[in-house]
Amino acid sequence: MADRKTKIIAVLPAYNAEKTLEKTLADIPRADIDEILLVDDASTDNTVALAERLGLPVVRHPSNRGYGGNQKTCYREALRRGADIVVMIHPDYQYDARLTPLLTGFIERGVCDVMFGSRIRTRAEALRGGMPAYKYFFNRALTALENLVLGQNLGETHSGFRAYS
């Protein structure tokens, strides 16, 4: 647990993450996070058993609520536990969890209220990292449209690696 006034909780919205959970968890800098919580969306593999074996607190959905429902539970539970900053890290290993302090640090210092990480620096890197080609295509198209409408130049607006105050 970090020695600071700000309570930072990492939430892992999981669905069938058994194969990548342990690797993701190993990369989260524990000194910079006060608590890690897994929210399982009715996985059919051994995600919950593995998370419990790894010592993670687990919130389980009895039935699949979908991606949005899982995120809502993550944020609601983190706030209930007293989080000042919530960082969401998908346990699918498409994001570099070692960068967590970069996301939370800007928020903790009052520079901004929200930080988004990105798994898309290059197409090849995203695809090698496990992102299906169709998801890459639609992610890029939707992000381009959103940038056009919002007048921004964001790299990825649908990131599973983000932090909020």
Regions found by a protein language model. Name each.
Residues 7-9:
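Cell-envelope/extracellular polymer assembly enzymes that use nucleotide-activated donors
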Residues 42, 66, 94:
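A short, conserved beta-strand element in the Rossmann-like catalytic core
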Residues 17-20, 43, 96:
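Donor nucleotide-sugar binding loop of glycosyltransferases
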Residues 83-92:
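Short beta-strand-to-loop acidic/aromatic patch adjacent to the donor-nucleotide binding site
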Residues 15-30:
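Short, well-formed alpha-helical segments that are part of the catalytic scaffolds
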Residues 59, 63-80, 97-164:
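Acceptor/aglycone-binding surface of glycosyltransferases and processive sugar-polymer synthases
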Residues 40-48:
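A conserved acidic beta->alpha catalytic loop
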Residues 14, 39-41, 61:
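Conserved sequence signature across two-component system core domains
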